Amino acid sequence: MERSRSFPTGEEIDLKAITIGAYVSLLEILQMAKDGKSIDEILAWAKEEIDHFACYFFVDDLRFFAHSGRVSHFSGFMGNLIGIKPIIQINDEGKMDSIGKVTGRKNALKALVKYVEDLGDDIKNHPFVLGDTDAPELANIVERMLREKFGDDLKIVRCYCNPTAGSHSGPDGVGVAFHAKHR
């Protein structure tokens, strides 16, 4: 009890994101703190900018969505059979939305890069997070595609998605999180 009195009251920031979507915002906030910004400056920035961090990823195996009830077992089986890869975004409320489907991993990787190309805003001056669920070789391909498109000076931070996210999406998924015009 005595120790809690020595700390100032906290402020909450709803990052409206999970995993890599939250990570990219936190990297920006940490840099602001390192640069000596006050808590009020950081909070004001967050209120304006949090909705300008987008997160998109694809799921490779629909069985995991079937297990969690996001799709029926039949849909998951059929989707896997024909190679459907849903593209998922974290929406303005911080919830996952399926925003499209492609067939095959190659098209899924291209779709992620296309979202960055279409929605990215000043991405070279902000952190860029590339995450995967036990798929470093796929993340390497996306990183190469991004560097070809945006140059080697793109500040890409690589990470593995946490086990909780991985248990819902399964292995072999890749996601991108970046500063965007909108989510």
Describe the role of every protein-language-model region:
Residues 1-11, 17-183:
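Mixed-charge interfacial surface used for oligomerization/domain docking
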